[in-house]
């Protein structure tokens, strides 16, 4: 079977939901200076945290590859994640960041797989709850491919 990508969340739905999340976050943080921590390939304040190797399953071992360059004490912090699966990475990260004494700390994710959760993390802003499938597009990749797709999709035909 040839490898294909099936659309799970169309481009228009992704754009609409991101706009809605942005409006809600702007409303919730009105008059405050929010410090974003993006657990992605890039962000405002960048922190690289991973529990994935080269495969499609979490390794279960969380590593911090790059830490923050500034203090969080007394600051309103919003962690932005692309996808939450088992919750291990975010549980570990939020525990570390809580010890740095932020004034507040909330979590935003574009995609959430609550049925895969093995660590309890409170997600304050969710784009989409999705089924337990390996997804690509909109920044998410499979073996360094499909990252630039404008929609969220599921790779089919992969063992």
At which residue positions do the language-model features occur?
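PRPP-associated nucleotide enzymes
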Residues: 1-159
């Amino acid at each position: 079977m040839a490898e294909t990508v099936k659309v799970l969340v169309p481009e228009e739905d992704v754009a609409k939901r991101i706009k809605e999340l942005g409006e809600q976050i702007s409303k919730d943080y009105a008059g405050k200076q929010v410090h974003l921590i993006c657990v992605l390939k890039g962000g405002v304040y960048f922190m690289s945290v991973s529990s994935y190797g080269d495969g499609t399953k979490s390794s279960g071992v969380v590593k911090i590859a790059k830490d923050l360059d500034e203090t969080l004490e007394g600051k309103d912090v919003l962690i932005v994640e692309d996808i939450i699966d088992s919750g291990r990475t975010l549980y570990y990260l939020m525990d570390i960041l809580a010890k740095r004494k932020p004034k507040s700390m909330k979590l935003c994710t574009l995609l959430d797989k609550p049925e895969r959760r093995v660590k309890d993390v409170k997600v304050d802003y969710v784009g989409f709850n999705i089924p337990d499938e390996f997804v690509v597009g909109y920044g998410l990749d499979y073996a360094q491919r499909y990252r630039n797709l404008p929609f969220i999709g599921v790779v089919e035909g992969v063992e």
